Amino acid sequence: MAEKLVIVSDMWGARKGLWITSYLGYLQQYFDITFYDSQQLANLDLTVNSEENIHNSFVHGGIDTAVAHLLKKEKAPCHYLAFSTGGTIVWNAAKKGLPVKSLYNVSSTRIRMENDKPAVPVTLLYGANDTFKPEETWADMLGLEMQVMPNYGHTLYSDEKVIKKVCLDLLQQVTKVAPTTKKAV
């Protein structure tokens, strides 16, 4: 039976998330996948879906609401892949008891404000040009390693090269499936 993988979107949810289909395409043959739209987890219902309005809604209660809903929905230990705000949601839910086998966070910048980490295996990936990525001193303080990809910004997770990297990382970490390479003859 396949391992369960829960994917939690960035703040835009499925609305601007066509890139998420690439992750699903790569990973669905290896995992039993559940997808959560961060806006739906947070019960956001905004008249104007501007970046500022969405961000403020998450910061002022939406993240906490999403954490509570995720805790109610997921009871069995599984793996998580989360993007930006979605990563903050899973990070905080894991600290409150969400059963997490592993957490792969991509561009989760708000966790830089946290002074403690969940007691689960965490992978952190950021773009070097992401203005709000955590500092190395923060990662050192929490005993975490951050992977930083040069020449990428906050939305690196929507780039096909990064999508392939993240999917391969997950496959190697979780399923222990090594990539097949053709030998030169």
Regions found by a protein language model. Name each.
Residues 2-73:
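Serine-hydrolase catalytic machinery in alpha/beta-hydrolase-like enzymes
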Residues 89-93, 114:
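Hydrolases whose catalytic domains are alpha/beta-hydrolase-1, hotdog thioesterase
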Residues 97-98, 113-120, 139-142:
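Short, conserved loop/helix-junction motifs that constitute active-site signature segments
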Residues 98-110:
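A conserved short beta-strand
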Residues 124-126:
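Short beta-strand/loop motif that positions the catalytic acidic residue
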Residues 151-162:
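Catalytic histidine-centered segment of alpha/beta-hydrolase-like enzymes
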